[in-house]
């Protein structure tokens, strides 16, 4: 299973020699000035511009530049060449993040139990609480584990009630649901609004016997109150809020924090994977940018402002902000290096460990030494209905060689002498008779 567009009318595949986008142009045109003014304008608001974040920007600026090295696909029959520049793997690069997301989605079917029903839950916190976390530079990533614990606890509680007459002993050590959860630190308009997206099984499974207890109904109101109580208890323990502040918050929100539930259709698998894509996707996309005014130093982007509850119809708004403010927010919301933002709990924690072990073993096999290239090829095939590793003229599979930075420029200059760059490919020049 993989993530791709549901649009059946796929565009033609035209390879790009070097990667460019409006988003990347913002960083290319304004990065140096942004670094100069950052401390004065944003240090007190967004914190230090760390070396790790600077490194992510520098990787983004070099993304798709053939001089940093590339993969070369050559057709032995037609002498057609395709150049695929190395990706930067920066967490700030929206293009590379989409590639990473596709690679993740390819393995989803090995992780999720497709025989079980699932539900998508969004755990939110009030604006007043968000402001406290923002002002105190709190580690909001802890919310992921807190939400997953609430989900497990409430399912176990309800299962004990439902199966009480059947005299089944249900302990939270022996019975587990499965869930995938992540943190979105901001709202759609790039405002600080930390919330958790979780996809969980509507069942609990015994760790040893693998017996399944299905839970068709969940006590939604209990979740809201349990989420608030567990959240406050955790951040009180972490000394982010005092006991007095915790009591004030709980008295103010007597019904708990809002928790939104969206059942995932059980008769089809695609909605489950689309929902999983949503929770794993980044907080911003290239397609949102409507306009960049370098003169005024402004960016206009479109964001989803509302979703009609019954029809699921989406409403959108445009927002124009200072380009430096945009850059500061993108860096502020960037996850810390090596921090796992998609986390697996319960039965899925075990399945992901098994999957990682198999991938690690495959990576050391001679026939699977180019797993990342195959991920790229699969992504192109599913997005454009084209096989990028095949020659566009004779359709035969092209030969792959890797060209590193020290010889990249010389290789390209040699190609330009004998070939013409046309529609994404280097084709042999027509010789005079």
Show where each model-derived region lies.
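Beta->alpha loop/short-helix hinge microenvironment recognizer with preference
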Residues: 1-433
């Amino acid at each position: 299973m993989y993530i791709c567009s549901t649009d059946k009318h796929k565009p033609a595949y035209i390879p790009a020699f070097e990667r460019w986008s409006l988003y990347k142009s913002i960083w290319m045109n304004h990065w140096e000035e942004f670094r100069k003014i950052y401390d004065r304008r944003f240090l007190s608001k967004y914190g230090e511009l760390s070396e790790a974040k600077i490194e992510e920007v520098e990787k983004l600026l070099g993304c798709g530049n053939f001089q940093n090295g590339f993969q070369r696909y050559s057709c032995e029959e037609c002498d057609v060449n395709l150049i695929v520049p190395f990706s930067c793997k920066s967490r700030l690069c929206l293009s590379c993040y989409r590639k990473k997301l596709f690679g993740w989605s390819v393995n989803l079917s090995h992780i999720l139990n497709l025989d079980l029903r699932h539900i998508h839950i969004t755990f939110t916190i009030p604006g007043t609480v968000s402001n406290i976390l923002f002002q105190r530079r709190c580690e909001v990533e802890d919310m992921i584990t807190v939400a997953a614990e609430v989900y497990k606890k409430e399912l176990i509680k309800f299962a004990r009630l439902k199966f009480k007459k059947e005299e089944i002993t249900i302990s939270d050590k022996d019975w587990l649901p499965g869930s995938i959860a992540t943190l979105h630190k901001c709202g759609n308009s790039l405002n600080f609004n930390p919330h958790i997206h979780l996809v969980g099984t509507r069942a609990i499974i015994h760790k040893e016997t693998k017996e399944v207890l299905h839970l068709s109904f969940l006590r939604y109101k209990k979740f809201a109150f349990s989420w608030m109580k567990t959240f406050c208890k955790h951040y009180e323990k972490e000394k982010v809020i005092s006991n007095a502040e915790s009591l004030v918050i709980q008295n103010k929100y007597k019904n708990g924090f809002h928790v939104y539930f969206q059942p995932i259709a059980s008769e089809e698998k695609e909605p489950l994977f689309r929902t999983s894509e949503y929770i794993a996707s980044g907080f911003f996309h290239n397609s949102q940018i409507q306009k960049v005014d370098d003169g005024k130093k402004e960016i206009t982007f479109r964001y989803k402002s509302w979703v009609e509850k019954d029809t699921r119809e989406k409403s959108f708004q445009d927002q124009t902000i200072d380009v430096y403010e945009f850059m500061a927010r993108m860096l502020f919301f960037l996850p810390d290096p090596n921090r796992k933002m998609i986390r697996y709990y319960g039965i899925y924690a075990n399945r992901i460990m098994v999957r990682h072990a198999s991938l690690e073993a495959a990576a050391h096999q001679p026939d699977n030494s180019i797993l990342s290239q195959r991920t790229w090829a699969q992504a192109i095939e599913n997005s454009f209905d084209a096989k990028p590793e095949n020659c566009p003229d004779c359709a035969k599979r092209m030969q792959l060689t890797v060209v590193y930075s020290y010889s990249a420029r010389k290789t390209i200059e040699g190609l330009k002498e004998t070939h013409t760059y046309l529609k994404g490919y280097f084709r042999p020049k027509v010789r005079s008779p």
